[in-house]
From Swiss-Prot:
Record's protein name: Leukocyte elastase inhibitor
Site (Reactive bond): 344-345
Function: Regulates the activity of the neutrophil proteases.
Keyword Nucleus part of the UniProt annotation: no
Cellular component per GO, a single term: extracellular space
Similarity-based family: Belongs to the serpin family. Ov-serpin subfamily.
MF GO annotations: serine-type endopeptidase inhibitor activity
Keyword Acetylation: yes
Source species: Xenopus tropicalis (Western clawed frog)
Gene name for this UniProt entry: serpinb1
Length: 377
């Protein structure tokens, strides 16, 4: 399972860099585990070059028993007897009703990913099909993502829509008090600032300082400590954009593990903005640009393990995500070398009044459920 979590983390940083090419300074928020799960379902029915490209881009080549590992991971994430937080990862295929999908593929998808095939009439009722898909996603994300497919996203030529939704709502183990929240400036870059609702608390929390990139790392656990938000904050803005350039260049699985391994509980004065991010991505161009091109090309895609025919291809991967961070905790949804320890003072400052990276981690499996950059209110 650790190999699978590592693969998903590798992929999340690769995808972040790709998204960054067209959005170097804006807010970013997506669920790598959600996108990886969706594409792993496609991989079950992919063959030849198409399968090789998916495996390579998602770093699945090093993962033994990939699909049974996903089955275990999904079961761990979707634990039913947890009362302290809500976390739901849901998958579904919507296929054109006249199109024949192979029984072996359907049973494998059901067994490994708990995903059913919903049959819809794309040919003569594409708009009704779109509404049905949106309703399903809205239900899975508790209404936070009401419309994953916008008007015109499907048409009479659509054969298959792959939908993956993830929803999370959790309370902080140590909540911020609402009376401590105040209007404060948030520095976007060296020249601009905006006002945010800045939360505050002083608590004993896992903390680390990374001198080589002048960054602070803070872990904010959720109730029961099964999940945490980890925030990586540069000391200040030292470049001409968000102040995150050096940190983003250094991002890797190895570095993140290194930075978060040696965290020490210490009294920290935490200043963190309340924020809400919503993002929508059409990932076809990014994934194709990363080397997963065949899947989206009629004539090149080999999904013969799904249907036995050669005319099936994926037209788009649409991913929508939502996160809200407040005094109580977080609500989020998405669809489709040793470290030199600095001499720690008794108290540390963690003032997130300028751009930072953050991720929400499932601690037992070390899986990054959500990854984001907060750079502008």
């Amino acid at each position: 399972m650790e190999n699978l979590s590592s693969a998903c983390t590798h992929f999340s940083f690769d995808l972040f860099r790709k998204i960054n090419e067209n959005n170097a300074t804006g807010n970013v928020f997506f669920s790598p585990i959600s996108i990886s799960t969706a594409l792993a379902m496609v991989l079950l029915g992919a063959r030849g070059n198409t399968a090789q490209q998916i495996s390579r881009i998602l770093h699945f080549d090093a993962v033994k028993d990939l699909h049974s590992n996903f089955q275990t991971l999904n079961a761990e994430i979707n634990k039913k007897n947890v009362s302290s937080y809500a976390l739901n990862l849901a998958n579904r295929l919507f296929g054109e009703k006249s199109f024949k999908f192979l029984p072996d593929f359907l049973s494998s998808v059901k067994k490994q990913y708990n995903a059913d095939l919903g049959t819809v009439d794309f040919i003569s009722a594409a708009e009704d099909a779109r509404k049905e898909i949106n309703t399903w996603v809205s239900e899975q994300t508790k209404g936070k993502i009401p419309e994953v497919l916008s008007a015109g996203a499907v048409n009479s030529f659509t054969k298959l829509v792959l939908v993956n939704a993830i929803y999370f709502k959790g309370d902080w183990a140590k909540k911020f008090k609402a009376e401590h929240t105040k209007d404060m400036p948030f520095q976007l870059n060296k020249k601009e600032q905006k006002t945010v609702k800045m939360m505050y608390q002083m608590e004993k929390l896992p903390f680390n300082y990374i001198p080589e990139i002048n960054c602070r790392v803070l872990e904010l656990p959720y109730v029961d400590y099964e999940l945490s938000m980890v925030i990586v904050l540069p000391d200040n803005i030292n470049d001409d954009t968000t102040g995150l350039q050096q940190l983003e260049k250094e991002l890797s699985l190895e570095k993140i593990n290194e930075w978060t391994e040696n965290m020490m509980p210490i009294d920290v004065h935490v200043h963190l903005p309340k924020f809400k991010l919503e993002d929508s991505y059409k990932l076809k161009s990014q994934l194709a640009g990363m080397g997963m091109a065949d899947l989206f090309e009629a004539g090149s895609a080999d999904l013969s393990g799904m249907s036995g025919s050669n005319d099936l291809y994926l037209s788009e991967v649409i991913h929508k995500s939502f996160v809200e961070v407040n005094e109580e905790g977080t609500e989020a949804a998405a669809a489709s070398a040793g470290i030199a320890m600095m001499c720690l003072m008794r108290e540390e400052e963690f003032n997130a009044n300028h751009p930072f990276l953050f991720f929400i981690r499932h601690n037992a499996t070390k899986s990054i459920l959500f990854f984001g950059r907060y750079s502008s209110p």
